[in-house]
Amino acid sequence: MTDARKALPLDLSLENKVKDLSQADFGYKEMQLSEREMPGLMELIAKHGAEKPLKGLKVTGSLHMTIQTAMLIKTLYELGADIRWASCNIFSTQDHAAAAIADSGMAKVFAWKGETLEEYWWCTEMALTWPDGSGPDLIVDDGGDATMLIHKGVEAEKNPALLEKSYDNKEFQIVMNRIALSMKNDPGKWTRVAAKVRGVSEETTTGVHRLYHMEKDGSLLFPAINVNDSVTKSKFDNLYGCRESLADGIKRATDVMIAGKTVVVLGYGDVGKGCAHSMRGFGARVLVTEIDPICALQAAMEGFEVVTMDEAAPEGDIFVTATGNFKVITGEHMERMKDEAIVCNIGHFDNEIDMAYLEDSTECSCLNIKPQVDKWTLKSGRSIIVLAEGRLVNLGCATGHPSFVMSNSFTNQVLAQLELASNPDLERKVYILPKKLDEEVARLHLARLGAKLTTLTDEQAEYIGVDKTGPFKPDHYRY
């Protein structure tokens, strides 16, 4: 049964909670290093910094607390926002980045690498709660946890019977314990908070799925902007970012030689495409699993072998999940894997791999090799190496995507926040940024790569029916 006593109490007198403030100087140095690689954010500061369009607005961030995110926070701060921040993953915080932001005073930060799930949800609620008990005007979300906590809180306030139940999902039970405590200490909190939220901008595929589901069933409580499906996010962060950061995570964790190995990539969306091409670039034989015939055909025509997981389980040396679905690697699959096969996930949540099978079985045992690297002995007698406890391998075992590609994503995030700030009367729907802004994000990053655009003549623009300054493609165009 849900039990408020199991939730960590909020302490609104806390300015910050990070692992080690003495790491702030290191964080500042890395932030300075990333500036040149994040031209989109720097341009937004130059363009909007003087007018402070976010002045007087409270912003909650629930997004990986990395050096790149520190630059996003700096941008929001320079635009006038009052900011509180938590990470959206228990392993993704870079403690020197959190220390630098906490020390700078640009935001109140509640994040450290290696949080427990109870601590994680405490941090999320701390980021959503100002000292006077009020909540945010705007939310920057990644995976939808901050948005979900508000929605589940409102749902429980309307139907307290939800708190009388027990939940099989361990993490969801922790969420409900958290909500039970907030309802005990501050009745009506979540309904009050939700009513003041102007909107949320969502970073990733998983969070966007949640938003569209709520929009469809009529439960979405405030407007949302789908940042993930901006072309300059999904076709860059998801594809090119994963193409570099996946290998970084696997190699830092295991020092394994990828060349000559068989790598199984589950899912061939934008993230899966980046992963498959990365592994092939390192010399691996790559197998792909897919449910979508279009994505499967794309993979096959790129020369990848498209198989089922039942076929791939005994073949793979390294397994990478990138589906956004759950239990795509089951206990049965793991039992059939090679001895010491490496299993990791680059989707947002930890349920793509059936970690419960490993954790709940008395016949499976775990030996921790080093942080975020566990050797699980299976019923079969063989072992597998699980990275980051099934959570994001690129952020759990390395430092995530490079600064340049994150500048694309985070420039979209800031533009989305500006749209929400300047349009307080939007309907409770999921929006996407207009094509003109998408093209502008790309334009801001060209000079850093030495790229130069061709300019249409008046006659050429008229011939193809576009404005000389864009947009150059219709909304339905697939890049």
Curated annotation (Swiss-Prot):
One of its GO terms (molecular function) is adenosylhomocysteinase activity. Its cofactor is NAD(+). GO terms for biological process: L-homocysteine biosynthetic process; one-carbon metabolic process; S-adenosylmethionine cycle. Substrate binds at residues 66, 142, 203, 233, 237. Pfam families: AdoHcyase, AdoHcyase_NAD. Gene3D superfamilies: Adenosylhomocysteinase-like (3.40.50.1480), NAD(P)-binding Rossmann-like Domain (3.40.50.720). It is found in: Cytoplasm. Keywords: Cytoplasm, Hydrolase, NAD, One-carbon metabolism. Pathway: Amino-acid biosynthesis; L-homocysteine biosynthesis; L-homocysteine from S-adenosyl-L-homocysteine: step 1/1. Binds 1 NAD(+) per subunit. Its EC number is 3.13.2.1. It catalyses: S-adenosyl-L-homocysteine + H2O = L-homocysteine + adenosine. Disulfide bonds: none annotated. NAD(+) binds at residues 204-206, 238, 267-272, 290, 325, 346-348, 394. One of its GO terms (cellular component) is cytosol. Belongs to the adenosylhomocysteinase family. May play a key role in the regulation of the intracellular concentration of adenosylhomocysteine. HAMAP family: AdoHcyase. This is Adenosylhomocysteinase. It comes from Oleidesulfovibrio alaskensis (strain ATCC BAA-1058 / DSM 17464 / G20) (Desulfovibrio alaskensis).
